[in-house]
Structures are given as C-alpha cells and as structure tokens.
C-alpha cells in the first residue's frame, strides 16, 4: 500500500554569508493516511525544518518528499498548520479569526462557511465564545481557536509545531486529551512536534526519534496502546516502558557528546521533560 506521506533521503542545509549549517541528513520515513505521528529530538535538530519541507514552504537541499505519490513542489492547500502560538488577529473576534483563511483566499465568506466555522468551534468547546476577542481568552482557548482555524479548509494533513508548549502543565494535558478526541472523531494525518516524551507517547500511533544535528531518524517506535487514552494510561507500565525507551536515546554517550557540541554552536540541547 502506497504511503500517504513519504520522506526519501531528505537533507537540508541552511546557507548564510558567514556559514552553512546542515540540519537534516538522509531522513527516511513513511506516514500512513490518518496516522498520528509525533516527532521528538534535541532542540535545533531540524524538526521544524522537516515540517516546513512537508508543507512546501522550503525545498530540501537533498532528497524528496511525496504526498500520496506526488512530489511536494510548493505550498500546499491540503495542509493545515498549528503553530506554537496561535497568532490570532487581535482586532477580529473568535469566529472571524477562524474564517480568516477563507476570507483571505476568496475575499468573502458565505453563510454555509459561517455555519461550518461555528460547528468547528463547537467541536473544540468554544461554541459560546464566537463573539469574544482574543484578549478575552485564556492561552488554551486561543490555541483551540488556532486548531479550529487549521481545520476550516478540511486539510488532509495537520502539522502541529509544539502547539502546547506555551501552556501551563494542566492546560497542556487537557489540550492533549482534547486533540485526541477531535482526531478520533474526524481522523487526519497528523505530524506533531513536541519536546515532551510523555505527550508524544500519549498522543501518537508512532514516535519518530531524531538525533542531534545534522539529524536523521534514529528509530520509529510504534505505540501500541488502546484508544481512547486517558489519565489512567499515564500510570500504566507499558506507557512508562515507552517513555523510558525514548528517553534513553538522549542519554547515550554519543548523543550527549554531539548535543553538547551543538549547544556550543548556540543550539540548545534537548529539554528533557517527561
């Protein structure tokens, strides 16, 4: 069966007047349709670059990325992106922020579009906040708006670049369970970057473990835990075994040495948080 997303020998180097920095080297992995894939690795190893390559925002220096067999050659409309910060427009209310991609693309929105946006806000638990302004919302609520906006055009692929990292621990955990519920109700192919190993194991079907720069995929770990995963899942031995296995990659001598070297080049090492 043809993979939905395929990275084949992907490498990327950033060039500047002072230096060239290779961040990705021979990255290979496949993603099935509707699979939830989490990506963990040291800071500065190129995780976000992977997602920019997939979304067509940058062209890889080496190799190729394909979506359902077709090479990625530029920005794609079938990919939704949720950033670390939701970047809401402060002068627009919640509903208009969700509708902004359609307004920007077509210049107008229909009553059908508004009903669709309202249904998405209901799905993320914000049905009563359509007329609220961003500054009236908590951080978690703002991120829910960002998720609804990313889903507006019904993308085949959802890219999430550390979407919960700016939230407090309790809100972050709540948002993880909320994301799982949304994904289970209407599955998407998800690539999710996180520095939290436990968050990766809790949410993903598969975790990609990346090494220090120039990074490649050290291992693909299938997460065989039943869904829906709950707060009780966090207490299970199998869950603990997965997090321990992943964490050990970042304490191996070779990885520690390379990561420390990267830190001297102003690249922060992995923030080792479970």
Task: Go through the PLM ranges and name each one.
Residues 110-129, 181:
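Conserved ABC ATPase "signature" region
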Residues 55:
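Helix-to-loop junction immediately C-terminal to a conserved catalytic motif
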Residues 40-42:
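The feature captures the beta-strand-to-loop junction immediately N-terminal to the Walker
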Residues 63-75:
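Conserved ABC transporter NBD signature motif
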Residues 15-17, 59, 92, 99-112, ...:
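ABC-type ATPase nucleotide-binding domains, specifically the catalytic core motifs of the NBD
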Residues 132-135, 153:
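Conserved signature/switch motifs of ABC ATPase nucleotide-binding domains
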Residues 147:
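Hydrophobic anchor residue at the start of the ABC signature
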Residues 158-161:
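Catalytic Walker B motif of ABC-type/P-loop ATPase nucleotide-binding domains
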């Amino acid at each position: 069966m043809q993979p939905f997303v395929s990275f084949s020998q992907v490498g990327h180097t950033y060039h500047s007047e002072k230096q060239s920095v290779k961040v990705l080297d021979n990255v290979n992995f496949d993603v099935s349709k509707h699979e939830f894939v989490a990506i963990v690795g040291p800071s500065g190893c190129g995780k976000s670059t992977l997602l920019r390559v997939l979304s067509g925002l940058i062209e890889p220096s080496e190799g190729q990325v394909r979506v359902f067999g077709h090479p990625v050659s530029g920005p794609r409309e079938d990919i939704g992106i949720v950033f670390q910060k939701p970047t809401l427009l402060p002068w627009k209310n919640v509903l208009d922020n969700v509708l902004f991609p359609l307004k920007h693309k077509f210049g107008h929105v229909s009553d059908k579009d508004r009903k669709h946006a309202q249904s998405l806000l209901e799905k993320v638990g914000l049905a009563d906040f359509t007329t609220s302004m961003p500054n009236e919302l908590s951080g978690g609520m703002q991120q829910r708006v960002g998720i609804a906006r990313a889903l507006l055009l019904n993308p085949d692929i959802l890219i999430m670049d550390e979407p919960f990292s700016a939230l407090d621990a309790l809100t972050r955990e709540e948002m993880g369970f909320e994301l799982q519920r949304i994904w289970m109700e209407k599955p998407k192919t998800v690539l999710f970057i996180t520095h939290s190993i436990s968050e990766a194991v809790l949410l993903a079907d598969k975790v990609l473990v990346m090494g220090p720069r120039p990074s490649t995929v050290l291992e693909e770990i299938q997460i065989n835990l039943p869904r829906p995963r709950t707060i009780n899942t966090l207490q299970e031995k199998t869950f603990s075994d997965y997090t321990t296995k992943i964490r050990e990659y970042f304490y191996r001598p070779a990885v520690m040495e390379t990561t420390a070297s990267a830190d001297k080049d102003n690249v922060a090492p992995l923030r080792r948080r479970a």
